[in-house]
Each structure stands twice: as structure tokens, then as C-alpha cells.
Amino acid sequence: MHLNYIDNYKSIIEIINEHKKVNNRDIRLIVVSKTQDYTKIIELEKLGQRDFGENYLDEAREKIIQINNPNIVWHYIGSIQSNKIKKISENFSWIHT
């Protein structure tokens, strides 16, 4: 049976919550949303997901503008070209490179 992204997300959250109880640690899930439609991000945010990762700057900027939600924490994932540093720093809270 093929799980849709909502069911898959809920399964992952259940596993994370079990590990949090056992290990008494804070675990933060970053959902990589590159190439995905912005409506999926909105749906996951409604379920409590706050951290989303992108590595295509132009695509990410479009999503950030379309969604316009201050509760979402945007993560830039991947290599950085020097000519894009300013735009990345203006749009993302975290950089993972």
C-alpha cells in the first residue's frame, strides 16, 4: 500500500515522539519540500510542522511569498553560490551546507 505524504508524515511524527520519550531529547524534524507544491507545506503546517528545507532559491522564494506564514522556519539546504548569499540570508532562518 502506498502512503500519501500526510500519512507518511504522521508515521514519522509517531516514531519521533516515541524516541523523544525514551531518550528525553528534543528532536526537530525538517521536512524537505523542494520540488513540492506549496499547498503541501500549508497542509503540514496545519498539522504542526514548522521547519521546511529548500535548496532551489527561486522556487523557495516563490513558496515563502505564497505561503506568507511567520510560523514557518525556512532552512536552506545545500551548496551556496556567492552571488546568492544575500538573497538566501534574507529569506532563510537557517543554512545547512
Where are these regions (language model features)?
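Conserved alpha/beta-domain cores
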Residues: M1-T97
